[in-house]
Curated annotation (Swiss-Prot):
Oligomeric and partner information: Monomer.
Gene3D superfamilies: Medium-chain alcohol dehydrogenases, catalytic domain, NAD(P)-binding Rossmann-like Domain
Name of the featured protein: Trans-enoyl reductase phm4
Disruption phenotype: Impairs the production of phomasetin.
InterPro entries (alphabetical): ADH-like_C (IPR013149), ADH-like_N (IPR013154), GroES-like_sf (IPR011032), NAD(P)-bd_dom_sf (IPR036291), PKS_ER (IPR020843), Trans-enoyl_RdTase-like (IPR047122)
Pathway: Secondary metabolite biosynthesis
GO terms assigned for molecular function: nucleotide binding; oxidoreductase activity, acting on NAD(P)H
Binding site for substrate: 136-143, 280-284
Keywords of this entry: NADP, Nucleotide-binding, Oxidoreductase
Source organism: Pyrenochaetopsis sp
The EC number(s) this enzyme carries: 1.-.-.-
Family under the similarity heading: Belongs to the zinc-containing alcohol dehydrogenase family.
Chain positions recorded as NADP(+) binding sites: 50-53, 171-174, 194-197, 212, 259-260, 349-350
Entry function: Trans-enoyl reductase; part of the gene cluster that mediates the biosynthesis of the trans-fused decalin-containing tetramic acid phomasetin, the stereochemical opposite of the HIV-1 integrase inhibitor equisetin. The PKS module of phm1 together with the enoylreductase phm4 catalyze the formation of the polyketide unit which is then conjugated to L-serine by the condensation domain of the phm1 NRPS module. Activity of the Dieckmann cyclase domain (RED) of phm1 results in release of the Dieckmann product intermediate.
């Protein structure tokens, strides 16, 4: 087993407790690099809305939370050697934190265990903090845009037609990732956002922006798209967002994909629109043990898509053609992760991706 870790020692990590929430523990075992697992010394993590939603029945006591991390490989399991990684390699990944089926796999730890196939190599020109902010957003967007919505093109094989695609929530981290991918794939992204975020969203590549608080938002999108919009990605997913997306889609209908379960009664208002929602961790190739409606069996086809898409994202990172959302980097250790989750729950985060730097905390 290349790399030696004293797994009898303990580490700091954010774990589930018996009260249905998370807490900082300094008594978490350091994981072994067994089977196809790799252990990474964490240098930065990012905090996503999904992390803040891990409450109540989604919490497994003792399981490590967190999806996005970046760091350096410090141990490699024997079945992971075929992936070509070496000790000291700079890597990042999006994994399934708070996982009842693999409770020792989670990003919010000083030493992260993950299956080798989830890892993405970080280019030398990119910082750990930037890399930690990329994977969940860009992996989920790939699934939503090029698998669920079925867009006819990709960043490496652009569409011949600059078809318009609506990104609802364009100023979110997922929204700016989607806009970049759409541009690279030859599409024309348009987006909803608050007026104060217009310049940010256009900087990432949106052709036009629309104020979601405007009662005429959907009508203005229909006018701009000449009643021909066929694709909508909903990065917010609530009643208002779905109503605007459905009202924006053209007269012949189209496809709508959300990042969370959507209101079925709104979906029923337009039968000519095909609605779907995605769960990013399904691309990792394992069962998802979260409660319904998120829990599900592994899907070999989506795993295959995920591995192909991960390789594509790694290539885009190496070329320097994608960038993270504007970062709010916080220092001070794992306790800052708890603060970030609380800030997301309190809706205090706007236009920034929360990243915790752990470089000085080992």
């Amino acid at each position: 087993m290349p790399g030696i870790i004293d797994s009898s020692s303990k580490q700091s990590a954010i774990v589930g407790n018996s009260y249905g929430s998370t807490e900082l523990s300094h008594n978490v075992p350091i994981p072994h690099a067994e089977g196809d697992n790799v252990v990474v010394r964490t240098r930065a993590v990012s905090v996503n809305p999904v992390d803040a939603k891990m409450m109540g029945p989604y919490v497994t006591a003792g399981a490590i939370a967190g999806c996005d991390f970046a760091g350096e490989i410090e141990a490699i399991g024997p079945e992971a050697l075929s992936w070509g990684f070496k000790i000291g390699d700079r890597v990042c990944a999006s994994i399934m934190g708070m996982n009842p089926l693999e409770p020792d796999h989670g990003a919010f730890a000083q030493h992260v265990a993950t299956h080798a196939n989830a890892l993405v190599r970080i280019p030398e020109t990119m910082s750990f903090e930037e890399a930690a902010a990329l994977c969940t957003c860009f992996m989920t967007c790939g699934l939503a845009l090029f698998q669920s919505l079925g867009l006819p093109g990709s960043p490496v094989k652009p569409s011949a037609s600059a078809t318009q695609v609506l990104v609802y929530g364009g100023a979110t981290a997922t929204g700016t990732a989607a806009i970049q991918l759409l541009r690279l794939a030859g599409f024309t992204p348009i987006a909803t956002c608050s007026p104060h975020s217009n310049e940010l969203v256009k900087t990432f590549g949106a052709e036009a922006t629309f104020d979601y608080n405007d009662p005429e938002c959907a009508a203005k999108i229909r006018a701009f798209t000449k009643n021909g919009l066929r694709y909508a990605l909903d990065c917010i997913t609530n009643r208002s967002s779905m109503q605007i997306c459905y009202g924006s889609l053209g007269r012949v209908g189209g496809r709508y994909t959300a990042l969370d379960p959507y209101p079925e009664d709104i979906a029923a208002t337009r039968k000519i629109v095909k609605a779907a929602w995605v769960v990013g961790p399904i691309m990792l190739g394992h069962d998802i043990g979260w409660p319904a409606p998120h829990g599900r069996k592994a899907d070999p086809d989506l795993f295959k898509f995920g591995m192909e898409w991960k390789k594509l994202v790694e290539g885009l990172m190496a070329k320097g053609v994608i960038k993270p959302h504007p970062l709010d980097v916080r220092k001070g250790g794992m306790e800052r992760v708890i603060e970030c989750m609380e800030a997301i729950r309190a809706k205090e985060v706007n236009g920034k991706k929360l990243v915790v730097s752990l470089r000085e905390n080992h």
